[in-house]
Each structure stands twice: as C-alpha cells, then as structure tokens.
C-alpha cells in the first residue's frame, strides 16, 4: 500500500494530501477489519445455526429475537468486508481502468447493503424493519431504545440523501442497465472517480459503526450473558479458509502480476480506442451524409462491432483487476471474497458473450456468427464455442451462487458465507484464466466480422454511388488546393465504397 500514492500519480495527480492520507488510513483500517472478520464470521455463522436449530436452549420468547440479532451481526460483518475489499483493490491499482473496475463495487454493494437493511421501499420487510418490529414486542429493557431510534433515523435520512447510482450498480453486476442493453452503457463506469466513491463510503460508514456498536451490546445483553454456558459449547461449522492455495502461486506471483498488468494496459488502450471511435465516427458519418447526400446507414454495423470490442476489453480489465486483488492479498478472507467476485464476473461474461440456455441476444448471435449465416464457422470461432460450452458444463457458475453473492437479502447472504468458505480456488483461477485467454480470440473474431461487413459495404457502395462522379467533376479543377485535395481524394475512396478510408482522409480537415 505504501507505493499507492507514487504509483498512481500518473492518473490521480488531482488527489490532495488529505485524500492520500485518508487512502492510507483506509488501507490499514481495511486490513484490521478483514483480519477481525476472518475470526468473526465463522463464530457467528455457528451461533446462527444454533439459535435456529431445535437443539437451542434459549427461551422460546427470546429465541426469535436472538435469531434476528445474530443474523444482523453476520450480515453487517459480511457486507462490510466485501465492500472494504473493493476499496482496497482500488488503492492497490496501478492503472486507472483497474482502479475504476474495483471502485464500481463500492456503489454497487452499498446499494445492495442498504436495500437489504432498510430498502428503498417496503421497509417493514427489510432486515432492520423486521428486527425493530419484533424487538418492540419482545424487549425487556429501554436501554437500547435511543440507539435503535438513532439508527432507524439514520437509515431513513440516508435513503433521502444517498449519492449512490442505481444504473452504475446494474452495470457493475450485469454489464448492462436493462436486458439487452447497449455495450456503450459501460462508458458510464469509465466516469467513476476515487473521490466520488470515497465520498459514498464516508456517507454510509457512520450507519455501519452505529449498528456494530449497538449489536455488541445487544448480543451481550440478550445472548452472551444469559446463555454463556450454551454459547461456549458451540463448535465451528465452517472449515478454515484456504491458505494452501497461495502456496501454489507463491513462486510465480511476480510473473503473474506482470502478465495481468500488461493485459490490463493492453485492454485499457483497446477500450480507449473503441471509445474514441464511438465518439468521433457517428459525427463524421453524419457530416459526410449531410455534405455529399450519401446514405451511410450501413456503417452502423461497423459501429456496433466497435461497441462489442469495447465491452470485451472492459470484461478483460474487470476480471484481471480482481485477479490482482486475489494474488496480492495475504488475508484469506479477502482472497475468498475476490474468488466470489471472480465467480460473478465470469458468470456475467459467459452470459453476455455466449448465453447459458440459448444464444438469443448474446454477442455470439449479434456480433461473432452473424455474417456467417448458414456457412461453416471458422476454427477460431468454433474454439470460442468449445471454451464457453466447457465453462458452462463445469457447473461452477450457477444462478443460485451468483444471486447469493450479488443480492444481500435474507437467506442469500447466509448462503453466500457458506459458499465463501467452500470456494475452489484452483477451479476459479483456471476458469478465469481460460476466459482471459479466449477474450482476445473473441476480439479477433469481431475484427473478422468487421472486415466482412466492410467488404459488403464497399461492394454495395461501389454499385449504387456512381452519382459521386458529378461532385468529382465539380471540384476536379481545384483538387490540388490543400483542403480540396483531401475532399477530392475522400470522394474517390467513397466512390469505391471505401468508407472508413474516406472518413480517415477527412477527419483532420
């Protein structure tokens, strides 16, 4: 972490000393929280199963209340850990795109956490709403009333003043805002800044601390003091988190980090190139259409391919960024949270690129195989299909597991904790590696599609745009003048259907 400030000066020169100090403090605090939570989660997971079992010796009148208290304690520790990992990943980043890939989960998980705790609607069905309703019936003291009222007010006020972004959350978790969304929506995630995400973090943090302080006292009063003997007999249910997995990679960490970083940098350049193309070319098409009365609607296919290339670059950056978090962490809980994030990312990539049940709406249908129609697919495209089918067949990416990791509502986060402690690091890493390797092949396939579309457009325009001869005759006498020369040459290219070449000739005029 000590190298964060110097390594990130290239793209964070505007961060002031106070922000850097906060970042360093946050990194160190995050380490402490994750180390503590590594001990806390197994403890409260076992207690939760005890208080929800038939063997529980707690008085029936208080049993349900204890279940809610322990459940919320579990939730708070799990939720805060996964969003601390996002911040730490951003602080570790050596590339702007890598930093933003981690930062987007701060907003996403604050939304998921708040939605589960209090909700944007239907507050009575939320974790906190149900707890308060039960507590008001079962309480035998007024000691905690003030604290509980303050938390309820804080949750209400947060909902009224939140600076979270629901569209960003959808993009972070699904790579689209709505079903069949445009890949260009991902450009919204490129606007994320560490200042904004830290502001979101600091806005929500007081609520978390109020709740943690309150539940320490509630647990002592309603559970640990009256049932101390029973609680001490509870045995752990979750296995110890893997520490052996890190030994597998120990000798190759530097090599792995270097390879991942190079891939992030290459895909970041690809992302920027696609971004520039998607910004400039529609304006150029419009200008040429207006100037020369030429129909360039066919060129939209070329832009759609650029959208797909942009998305594939983003997928690769996202997956590589969480791999770096995993390989650079020495905290078992953080590594396993990174593995769960890998699972979410890989699930979403497979879904968007290929689809699980069918290919409808996938990039496979829209971009990769569309030009081939009933033709035999090239070997490179068949290889993409084989890799995707193999990943689906591995049964690593189930909807239940994904929902547990993404949506923090009741029962989901209990399952998520169980999944967290039963991750298969080698399988997750091998599958992630397979996806990272196949994404450039998908990009090559899309380039092949672009060439095919470009060829079709050229043939079409060469046939139907003979009218350009009239414009050529008009400006031929002036074709050697500086600006006219470029226009004349671009018209010659346009006549042959070489539209992209014509645009490139004109764009610097």
Ranges and model annotations:
Residues 167-174, 400-407:
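Long, charged low-complexity segments
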Residues 1-163, 181-397, 412-509:
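Amphipathic alpha-helical interface segments
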């Amino acid at each position: 972490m000590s190298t964060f400030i110097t390594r990130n000066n290239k793209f964070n020169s505007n961060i002031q000393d106070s922000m850097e100090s906060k970042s360093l403090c946050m990194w160190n605090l995050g380490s402490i929280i994750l180390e503590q939570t590594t001990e806390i989660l197994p403890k409260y997971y076992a207690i939760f199963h005890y208080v929800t079992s038939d063997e529980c010796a707690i008085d029936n009148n208080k049993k349900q209340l204890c279940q809610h208290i322990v459940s919320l304690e579990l939730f708070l520790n799990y939720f805060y850990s996964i969003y601390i990992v996002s911040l730490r990943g951003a602080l570790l980043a050596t590339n702007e795109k890598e930093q933003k890939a981690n930062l987007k989960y701060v907003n996403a998980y604050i939304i998921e956490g708040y939605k589960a705790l209090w909700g944007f609607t239907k507050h009575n069905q939320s974790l906190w709403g149900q707890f308060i309703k039960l507590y008001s019936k079962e309480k035998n003291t007024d000691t905690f009333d003030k604290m509980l009222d303050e938390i309820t007010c804080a949750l209400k006020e947060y909902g009224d003043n939140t600076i979270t972004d629901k569209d960003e959350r959808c993009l972070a978790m699904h790579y689209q805002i709505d079903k069949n969304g445009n890949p260009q929506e991902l450009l919204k995630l490129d606007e994320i800044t560490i200042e904004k995400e830290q502001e979101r973090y600091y806005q929500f943090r007081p609520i978390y601390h109020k709740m943690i302080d309150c539940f320490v006292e509630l647990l002592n009063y309603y559970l640990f003091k009256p049932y101390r003997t029973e609680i001490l007999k509870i045995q752990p249910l979750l296995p110890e988190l893997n520490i052996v997995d890190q030994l597998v990679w120990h000798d190759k960490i530097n090599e792995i980090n270097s390879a991942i970083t190079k891939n992030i940098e290459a895909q970041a350049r690809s992302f920027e190139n696609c971004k520039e193309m998607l910004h400039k070319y529609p304006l150029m098409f419009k200008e040429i259409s207006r100037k020369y009365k030429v129909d360039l609607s066919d060129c939209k296919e070329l832009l759609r391919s650029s959208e797909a290339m942009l998305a594939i670059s983003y997928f690769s950056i996202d997956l590589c960024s969480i791999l770096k978090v995993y390989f650079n962490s020495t905290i078992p809980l953080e590594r396993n949270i990174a593995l769960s994030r890998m699972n979410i990312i890989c699930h979403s990539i497979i879904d968007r690129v290929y689809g699980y049940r069918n290919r409808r709406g996938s990039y496979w249908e829209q971009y990769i195989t569309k030009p081939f129609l009933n033709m035999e697919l090239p070997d490179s495209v068949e290889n993409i299909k084989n890799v995707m089918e193999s990943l689906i067949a591995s049964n690593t990416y189930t909807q239940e597991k994904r929902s547990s990791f993404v949506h923090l509502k009741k029962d989901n986060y209990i399952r998520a904790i169980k999944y967290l402690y039963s991750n298969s690091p080698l399988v997750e890493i091998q599958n992630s590696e397979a996806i990272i390797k196949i994404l450039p092949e998908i990009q090559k396939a899309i380039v092949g599609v672009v060439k095919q579309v470009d060829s079709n457009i050229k043939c079409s325009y060469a046939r139907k745009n003979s009218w350009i001869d009239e414009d050529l005759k008009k400006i031929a006498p002036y074709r050697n003048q500086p600006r006219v020369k470029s226009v004349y040459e671009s018209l010659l290219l346009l006549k042959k259907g070489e539209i992209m070449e014509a645009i490139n000739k004109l764009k610097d005029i």
